[in-house]
A protein has these predicted regions:
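Short amphipathic alpha-helical interaction segments
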Residues: 293, 443-458, 471
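Short acidic, hydrophobic short linear motifs in intrinsically disordered regions
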Residues: 429-440
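Conserved N-terminal catalytic/coupling substructures associated with nucleotide/phosphate chemistry
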Residues: 1-297, 302-407, 431-432, 461-464, ...
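Short, cationic-aromatic polyanion-contact patches
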Residues: 464-480
Length: 480
């Protein structure tokens, strides 16, 4: 940093009156701060590094007080940097302004293979920090582990599961996998099947691996109850919102089975809980069915979570979360972005693969292509539906994707869902909530009423038998 750039930073501080994720402010009017290691660690452990500026007092309204001694403070800063592991090499700059001296310390980002950078006096587990907004927070045990797992190339997807026997696997599915695997590979086909199990990591030293459990066991949740998907439909746009009948969830399901089963179950859950409209395409003049979300994008997002979630012992108790809000869908999986790739590079560069064996097995079973095309497909399908591009979040050991619906106006003329015609005929006879829900084939009565019936009530198409008590358990719905 040049002296001119440091002066510009000082001016920026006076405008912002705050610290940021890459800017830390210290007074140092009476001496060098004794505890810099938390900021040295957190800045080193993030991709953008950070800058510490000495000589501005936050407690005095960001007053420019200057440092006590520009020469001595540089020595003290460097002394604390030498106590980090690996050693932090700051770039120090000194500038004079209005008779006061100010010092900046630029902290470079450490290579991912050197992270976490930690304070030697506290050790790796307690001396590693991460930056959250303007705060330095101690890393969790899992956050420390995630760096170690990448550096040492841990293969959590093929760790041995002693509780599972070979007989617990679906033998028919295994036979299909071996058949697909051997196809077009004469050398592999000549190898005995038992050896292929070891070669392809179904077994390790004749013991079953996690990948085999997740892909070939009929019910992996018998061994790992939380390696599942928890799917919910929320009545509002935030968790905790209460629906018209006092319900917290319009639909709620625990989706279990092997990875293929969970994928199918999650897609079915989303399909039954999103609306499908019939529209008139203004360009072709033809009727088209248009769901809230492109189902291809939904499938890729769910599959991405199942394949790339963290399967280490640290996350065994953390399920994937699928949450459908009024305006969006969120899919959250344990395990942040793996390896060197950054959030803005997703779908543009080839990433490191956290679970290569799981991905390879699913490729052989023709469930995934394993060609890194998932995120580009999601983006393309959202664009074709004229919806907002997906939002990706990497937050302290978890990864989320958000798909938004109805953000942009369609260049089409929408008409009522053709299913409404049948519903109106059904309601020629007054019906209870349960009768309507059963007729629509929906498990959640509250969801059926809120999403399919109440919009028609609001338009005056369907009427309530007790309009003055809309929540009455004796309420009937009918149309003239």
């Amino acid at each position: 940093m040049t002296t001119e750039e440091l002066l510009e930073k000082l001016e920026l501080i006076q405008k912002m009156k705050c610290e940021t994720s890459t800017l830390e402010i210290k007074s140092a009017e009476q001496g060098c701060p004794q505890r810099l290691y938390d900021t040295l660690s957190s800045f080193s452990n993030q991709d953008d590094g950070g800058i510490i500026i000495f000589g501005v007092d936050e407690k005095q309204g960001y007053k420019e007080v200057g440092v006590y001694d520009p020469q001595d403070i540089q020595k003290k800063i460097n002394e604390q940097c030498l106590q980090m592991e690996p050693t932090v090499r700051p770039l120090l700059t000194v500038v004079e302004k209005d008779g006061n001296f100010f010092v900046s310390a630029e902290i470079p980002s450490a290579d991912i293979t050197d992270r976490p950078v930690f304070y030697q006096g506290k050790g790796r587990m307690k001396g590693s920090y991460t930056r959250v907004g303007d705060s330095d927070e101690p890393m969790t045990e899992y956050e420390v582990y995630s760096y170690e797992a990448y550096r040492k190339k841990y293969q959590d997807d093929i760790r041995v599961i002693d509780r599972v026997s070979f007989a617990a696997l679906d033998q028919e599915l295994l036979a299909t996998y071996i058949e697909f695997l051997k196809k077009g590979k004469p050398r592999l086909a000549a190898i005995p099947t038992d050896e292929i199990y070891e070669l392809m990591s179904i077994k390790r030293d004749n013991r079953i691996t996690l990948s085999a459990v997740m892909n070939f066991c009929p019910y992996p949740q018998a061994y790992f109850p939380q390696l599942c998907i928890i799917a919910t439909v929320v009545p509002g746009t935030e968790l905790g919102t209460i629906g018209e009948q006092g319900e917290r969830f319009l639909d709620n399901q625990r989706i279990e089975g092997n990875i293929s089963d969970m994928l199918d179950g999650a897609i079915q859950f989303v399909s039954r809980n999103m609306r499908t409209k019939t529209i008139i395409n203004s360009q072709t003049g033809k009727r088209e069915d248009r769901s809230d979300y492109p189902i291809t994008a939904v499938r890729e997002a769910i599959l991405n979570a199942l394949v790339h979630r963290d399967y280490s012992i640290h996350t065994e108790g953390m399920p994937i979360q699928l949450i459908m809000f009024e305006d969006r869908m969120e899919i959250r999986n344990p395990g942040g972005i793996y390896g060197r790739i950054k959030i803005d590079q997703l779908g543009k560069v080839q990433p490191d693969t956290r679970n290569p064996v799981i991905a390879s097995e699913l490729e052989v079973l023709k469930i995934t292509e394993n060609r890194y095309s998932g995120i580009p497909t999601i983006r393309r399908m959202m664009r074709e539906y004229d919806l907002q591009q997906p939002e990706f979040l990497d937050e302290r050991g978890s990864f989320s994707i958000k798909l938004y619906k109805n953000v942009k106006e369609y260049n089409v003329a929408e008409i009522e869902n053709v299913d409404n015609e049948d519903l109106l005929l059904f309601c020629k006879t007054p019906r209870t909530r349960k009768e309507i829900s059963d007729y629509l084939g929906l498990n959640s009565v509250a969801y059926a009423i809120q999403t399919r019936v109440m919009p028609l009530v609001d338009k005056g198409i369907i009427k309530m038998s007790i309009p003055e008590k809309p929540k009455s358990s004796k309420q009937l719905f009918y149309c003239d």
